[in-house]
């Protein structure tokens, strides 16, 4: 990155950091983004250059930033002695821990995402893909898609649980995630005949149902 690119990136991070605070006061909208720029002593013109697509681009920048932090933290705890099941669990927990300090703002972001299912699925798929790859998955066949769809369901349903979790250290969420992963492992043990009846389409429908629940959350 050259000097100008570093400056550009620094300003984008500054806006994002401020926006995660301002979302709690103004909601997730254009006015909030403008207010965040003002709070960072930046003009609306500069804001337009930093995030030309407004809120949508801010959200994408947020998800990309979280992805980088998640992979960095996963790599810190990587061990060949950990089961794949536990690597998946750790990946989801690490991501939720990154969300913790901005929990209410994160809720706003995901409720907003639920209104645009296609974009939401794209982000869910990317998260699941990164977690699977970090766990050592190199599958390229039909299982490649099923694994990512199932993890998207596990992650999104766990996120919904986490939003309502008031227990210390999110213990309720951790128990919920363990149960969800166990359900997926049970699915993996079923015969190919049974699996064929539980298609990727049915998993996709489960995701749609959770997105509808997210959309109805009051923020």
Q: For each of these PLM feature ranges, what is it?
A:
Residues 2, 7-35, 39-42, 53-60, ...:
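Short, amphipathic alpha-helix enriched in basic
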Residues 96-118, 125:
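Amphipathic alpha-helical segments used for helix-helix packing
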Residues 190-219:
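Long, charge-rich low-complexity segments
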Residues 115-137, 146-152, 156:
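Amphipathic alpha-helical packing segments from all-alpha helical-bundle domains
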Residues 45:
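Key DNA-contact positions within bacterial/archaeal DNA-binding proteins
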Residues 137-153, 157-199:
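Hydrophobic/aromatic-rich alpha-helical bundle segments in the mid-to-C-terminal region
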Residues 9, 73-105:
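Hydrophobic alpha-helical connector segments
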């Amino acid at each position: 990155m050259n000097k100008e690119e570093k400056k550009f990136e620094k300003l984008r991070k500054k806006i994002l950091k401020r926006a995660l605070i301002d979302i709690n006061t103004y909601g997730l909208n254009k006015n909030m983004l403008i207010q965040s720029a003002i709070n960072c002593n930046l003009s609306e013109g500069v804001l337009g250059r930093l995030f030309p697509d407004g809120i949508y681009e801010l959200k994408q920048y947020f998800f990309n930033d979280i992805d980088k932090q998640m992979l960095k933290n996963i790599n810190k705890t990587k061990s060949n002695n950990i089961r794949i099941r536990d690597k998946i669990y750790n990946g989801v927990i690490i991501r939720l821990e990154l969300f913790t300090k901005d929990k209410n703002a994160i809720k706003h972001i995901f409720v907003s995402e639920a209104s645009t299912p296609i974009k939401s699925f794209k982000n869910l798929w990317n998260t699941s893909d990164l977690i699977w790859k970090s766990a050592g998955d190199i599958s390229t066949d039909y299982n490649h898609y099923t694994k990512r769809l199932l993890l998207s369901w596990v992650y999104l349903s766990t996120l919904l649980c986490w939003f309502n979790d008031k227990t210390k250290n999110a213990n309720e969420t951790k128990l919920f995630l363990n149960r969800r992963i166990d359900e997926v492992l049970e699915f993996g043990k079923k015969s190919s005949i049974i699996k064929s009846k539980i298609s990727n389409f049915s998993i996709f429908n489960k995701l749609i149902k959770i997105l509808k629940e997210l959309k109805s959350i009051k923020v």
